From Swiss-Prot:
Keywords: Acyltransferase, Amino-acid biosynthesis, Arginine biosynthesis, Autocatalytic cleavage, Chloroplast, Multifunctional enzyme, Plastid, Transferase. It comes from the Eukaryota. This is Arginine biosynthesis bifunctional protein ArgJ, chloroplastic. The active site is at T244 (nucleophile). It holds the Pfam family ArgJ. It comes from Oryza sativa subsp. japonica.
Length: 463
């Protein structure tokens, strides 16, 4: 259906700025930092950035120039008063890109965002609600999404098509639209470029998550400092090809629309599409990426320039950091599993093998049981759908080689079991390294162990 027509103000008209108090942290453990906006509700995930020519900075989605965010409680959750409405807004028309679920039963907000991005190259804000997925809700659910976008647009004095919507929660439930609309004036009034604004938004989008996921980095491209920030949610119903995970990325780099969309697709394929918790692909997966262009960096117009390659690597790092935090926070998990595959013919084949290992319920259960059962790893490599010479298969668990040239190696089983136990005791990382030949292709995937707690959480999710 055609979108309602609203007056679009000058693209450089700033949004309201309501400054809030600075972000405060308390850190009994580095991986469990408590933010002021989230205090009493949820802690922050560990920062799991890969190494590279960038530095971590504070601010999440508000780190980049031109962005504000807010998260409030609007009464959408079934119980409790944890924030459940988030808004990320840009002062200018931001170049927009998105990636969406492959589930055929796509939620109303996914269908809406895809329609908007098919006709628009820019956006001004992303509204996210937690509590109702608004999936499998028919025409009425879709209209709820349009009405929500329209209501936000009027408060921000922009077009309805400038607003994107994300939803997460119980499938089959429509948005509590009255509660949402009644909360929007307060939500818009809370918009802030502060760190607290970013972190309150990161908390508001969570559901069964035990931690919020927020990250920001700064790098220098062409002598100009640029920032990329992001937030994500996800803990269960996580499987490659986007799963119940929502993500919002922001940057002050200036990138042409076509290049930005290709960069986002590439980074998603190397990050969010490489995580798995339970093998379920959600109806609501959605990553939205906004580029304000306010850094002062000349526009990136091609994929193959040095500046584009530097920026792509930084974008990869931010998305991988968020993706790893999601896998780390897998429902009931005691550790993160990182699978690295080398020696494949190309990156795509290596990524598929890594995904196969990280997705294996038997591998995940073995890690939880602190059982160094390399046979399960070898099996999951073999059924990945990628052809390789089994006589060149190498497998290591941490620093402990388990298989070489397709043959099992003698190893200290108690040391290998202790390696798994130690990782679980501190909610650390279990590294599984696989080589399938001498090709130049490499890739990574991330998952988590599979515990009794996972069944308990999901058996009681709607009850």
């Amino acid at each position: 259906m055609p979108p309602p027509s609203l007056l679009l103000l000058h693209p450089r008209t700033p949004l309201p700025h309501h400054h809030r108090s600075s972000f405060r942290t308390s850190s009994p453990r580095p991986s469990r930092m408590v933010c002021a906006a989230a205090e009493g509700f949820i802690s922050a995930a560990p920062i799991l950035l890969p190494d590279g020519p960038w530095k971590q900075v504070e601010g999440g989605v508000t780190a980049a120039k031109g962005f504000k965010a807010a998260g409030i409680y609007g009464g959408l959750r079934a119980k409790g008063e944890k924030p459940d409405l988030a808004l990320v807004a840009c002062d200018v028309d931001a170049t927009v890109a998105g990636a969406f679920t492959t589930n055929v039963v796509a939620a109303a907000p996914v269908l809406y965002c895809k329609r908007v991005l098919n006709s628009s190259k820019t956006a001004r804000a992303v509204l996210i609600n937690a509590g109702q997925a608004n999936a499998a809700t028919g025409d009425a659910g879709y209209q709820d999404t349009v009405d929500s976008a329209d209501a936000v647009a009027k408060l921000l004095n922009v077009s309805t098509n400038d607003i994107l919507i994300q939803s997460t929660g119980v499938i089959g439930q429509r948005i509590k639209k009255e509660a949402l609309v009644n909360s929007l004036h307060r939500l818009v009034g809370s918009l802030s470029s502060s760190i607290e604004g970013a972190n309150s938004a990161a908390v508001a989008i969570t559901t069964t998550d035990l931690v919020s996921k927020s990250i920001a980095v700064q790098t220098e491209i062409g002598g100009v400092p640029i920032k990329i920030g992001g937030m994500a949610k996800g803990s269960g119903m996580i499987h490659p090809n986007m799963a119940t995970m929502l993500g919002v990325l922001t940057t002050d780099a200036q990138v042409s629309s076509d290049v930005w969309r290709e960069m986002v697709r590439t980074s998603v394929s190397r990050s969010f599409n490489q995580i798995t918790v339970d093998g379920d692909t959600s109806t609501n997966d959605c990553v939205i990426a906004l580029a304000s262009g306010l850094s002062g960096l000349s526009s990136i117009l091609t994929h193959d320039s040095t500046e584009a390659q530097q920026f792509q690597a930084c974008l990869d790092a931010v998305m991988q950091g968020l993706a790893k935090s999601i896998a780390w926070d897998g429902e009931g998990a005691t550790c993160l599993i990182e699978v690295t595959v080398a020696g494949a013919n190309n990156e795509a084949e290596a990524a598929k093998i890594a995904r196969s290992v990280a997705s294996s319920s038997l591998v995940k259960a073995a890690v939880f049981g602190r059982d160094p059962n390399w046979g399960r790893i070898a099996c999951s490599v073999g059924y990945s759908g990628i052809q390789f010479d089994a006589d060149q298969l190498d497998i290591s668990l941490g620093a402990i080689p388990l298989m070489k040239n397709g043959q099992p190696l003698p190893f200290d089983r108690s040391a290998a079991s202790k390696y798994l136990k130690d990782a679980g005791d501190i909610h650390g990382t279990v590294n599984i390294d696989v080589s399938v030949g001498r090709g130049g292709g490499s890739g990574k995937a991330w998952g988590c162990d599979l515990s009794y707690k996972y069944v308990e959480i999901n058996a009681e999710y709607t009850t």
